[in-house]
Amino acid sequence: MILYIATPYGFCSGVKKSISLAEKVLSNEGEVYTLGALVHNPKVIEELSKKGIKILEKNGFVEGKALIVRAHGLPQRDIEFYRTLGNRVYDATCPLVKKVQILAEYLNKNKYKVVIIGEKNHPEVIGILSYTDDQGIVVENEDDIKKIENYPKIGIVFQTTQSLDNALQKVNLIMEKGKEIRIFNTICPETIERQEKAKKLSEMVDLALVLGGKNSANTRRLYITLSKKIPTYHIENIEEIDKSWFKEDNKVGIITGTSTPNDFVEEVVELLKSLYPLEIHLV
């Protein structure tokens, strides 16, 4: 069996920074809560939980504690609320997400109708929307675009894990809705790179394994890209892998979402090694 592993794999830089900050705060504070799941990967959340990092779910109430803003960010009002309760709030928002928040706030203050291309219910998008005083428009599909009125000034930003192809299609449809339109490409470069690697893998292999959380937006998009071309399996844990999927003469591809730990890749590689002799290539 020949195995092609798409690079980069494992955590993106934003996830690394968020986890590093959480562990540092835990070391200094002793007791720590994250405001929602820090990242969208159950394996990572389980490991953080074992270390003592707890999750404060939506509408949870604590006072005088150390709290960490999740990598996807939070609405401004939530952060302000927890601070009024005497909590020490540490911001682990991905720097690229923070950039989108700042841009959305800038555009809103300068009288642009802010359009966020992304998923309405994704925590990142909900957070960005708050920086427009909740006056922005979230575009998830073409029906959302049809509802947009004509505005003199429109500013467009993107959920950082959007696929570039999907985003460009929507931008083209929005162009006729405003006289002045400013577009900021806020899609994460690592997300774009992994999408391109998914396309490349689809031309090289017989089947693909997409490793990452089922609740991870960027991982789902990798799965969608690959599954259009070849048999593809979205794997969250090793128990989901069925050995009957593989044959000795297979060319198999592995690609990971941006919050998938390296050790999960290694775990899957070891499983494949136990099935057939394995020739490994990085692509």
Swiss-Prot record:
Positions that bind [4Fe-4S] cluster: C12, C94, C188
Keywords linked to the UniProt accession: 4Fe-4S, Iron, Iron-sulfur, Isoprene biosynthesis, Metal-binding, Oxidoreductase
Positions bound to dimethylallyl diphosphate: H40, H72, H122, S216, N218, S259
Active-site residues (renumbered): E124
Protein name: 4-hydroxy-3-methylbut-2-enyl diphosphate reductase
Cofactor: [4Fe-4S] cluster
Annotated residues for binding of (2E)-4-hydroxy-3-methylbut-2-enyl diphosphate: H40, H72, H122, T160, S216, N218, S259
Example of a GO biological process term: isopentenyl diphosphate biosynthetic process, methylerythritol 4-phosphate pathway
HAMAP family: IspH (MF_00191)
Enzyme nomenclature, EC number: 1.17.7.4
Cofactor note: Binds 1 [4Fe-4S] cluster per subunit.
Molecular function GO terms recorded: 4 iron, 4 sulfur cluster binding; 4-hydroxy-3-methylbut-2-enyl diphosphate reductase activity; metal ion binding
Reaction(s) catalysed (UniProt annotation): isopentenyl diphosphate + 2 oxidized [2Fe-2S]-[ferredoxin] + H2O = (2E)-4-hydroxy-3-methylbut-2-enyl diphosphate + 2 reduced [2Fe-2S]-[ferredoxin] + 2 H(+); dimethylallyl diphosphate + 2 oxidized [2Fe-2S]-[ferredoxin] + H2O = (2E)-4-hydroxy-3-methylbut-2-enyl diphosphate + 2 reduced [2Fe-2S]-[ferredoxin] + 2 H(+)
InterPro entries named among the record's database cross-references: LytB/IspH (IPR003451)
Pfam families: LYTB
Organism: Dictyoglomus thermophilum (strain ATCC 35947 / DSM 3960 / H-6-12)
Pathway: Isoprenoid biosynthesis; dimethylallyl diphosphate biosynthesis; dimethylallyl diphosphate from (2E)-4-hydroxy-3-methylbutenyl diphosphate: step 1/1; Isoprenoid biosynthesis; isopentenyl diphosphate biosynthesis via DXP pathway; isopentenyl diphosphate from 1-deoxy-D-xylulose 5-phosphate: step 6/6
Protein task: Catalyzes the conversion of 1-hydroxy-2-methyl-2-(E)-butenyl 4-diphosphate (HMBPP) into a mixture of isopentenyl diphosphate (IPP) and dimethylallyl diphosphate (DMAPP). Acts in the terminal step of the DOXP/MEP pathway for isoprenoid precursor biosynthesis.
